[in-house]
């Protein structure tokens, strides 16, 4: 019997995966206080790329340092990207050896930003996240300007990923972070173009994806 897991697979975009094994995105939290990629990321993905995996997904790389999943996340924004271009290229080189695909997971934590990082995180509405033992602040509903700025941030980070050798990106739209908050009718109670039916709630995700010319 043919083992499909070990067979190559061509994605609709034309990218060829050497097999059908994927390392899921798992937050690394090994950046320092500057939130820059470092040697730890290079070493980790160098090791994983030796594991005969078709796709390696990174942990969430944040687009906005004010809204992080954790204090040791990598952030790529217009203020710091030049300081880590070399490291990002080394990271991608390590993660793409042995014909491995390396996709950067791009994220914005939204209301799920820990309170010690930001007590007033951005979100589609002001519905606070209540989890026993966790400290999350009351979010500030995003303005139209905020939403357009976030779209620009997602696109910028994707652009840097491409330019530094990552072979794809994943927009993190699950696990309670910003994009999934907009998708959820329980969190997104907006009555403008970014809320309401599922098409409108998905507009942030669709617009970010459409603006990214990968």
What are these regions (language model features)?
Residues 51, 164, 212:
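Structured loop/turn residues at beta-strand edges in well-structured enzyme cores
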Residues 1-107, 150:
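N-terminal capping/small domains of soluble enzymes
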């Amino acid at each position: 019997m043919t083992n499909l897991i070990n067979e190559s697979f061509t994605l609709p975009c034309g990218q060829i995966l050497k097999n059908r094994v994927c390392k899921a995105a798992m937050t690394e939290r090994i950046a320092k206080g500057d939130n820059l990629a470092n040697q730890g990321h290079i070493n980790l993905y160098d090791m994983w790329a030796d594991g005969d995996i078709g796709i390696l997904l990174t942990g969430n790389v944040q687009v906005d340092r004010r809204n992080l999943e954790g204090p040791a996340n990598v952030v790529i924004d217009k203020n710091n990207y030049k300081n880590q271009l070399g490291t990002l290229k080394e990271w991608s080189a390590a993660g793409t050896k042995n014909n491995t695909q390396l996709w950067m997971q791009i994220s914005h934590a939204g209301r799920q930003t820990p309170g010690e990082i930001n007590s007033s995180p951005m979100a589609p509405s002001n519905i606070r996240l209540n989890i026993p033992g966790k400290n999350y602040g009351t979010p500030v509903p995003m303005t139209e300007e905020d939403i357009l700025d976030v779209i620009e941030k997602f696109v910028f980070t994707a652009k840097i990923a491409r330019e530094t050798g990552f072979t794809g990106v994943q927009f993190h739209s699950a696990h309670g972070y910003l994009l999934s908050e907009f998708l959820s009718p329980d969190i997104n109670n907006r009555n403008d173009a970014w809320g309401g039916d599922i098409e409108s709630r998905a507009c942030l995700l669709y617009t970010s994806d459409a603006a990214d010319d990968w």
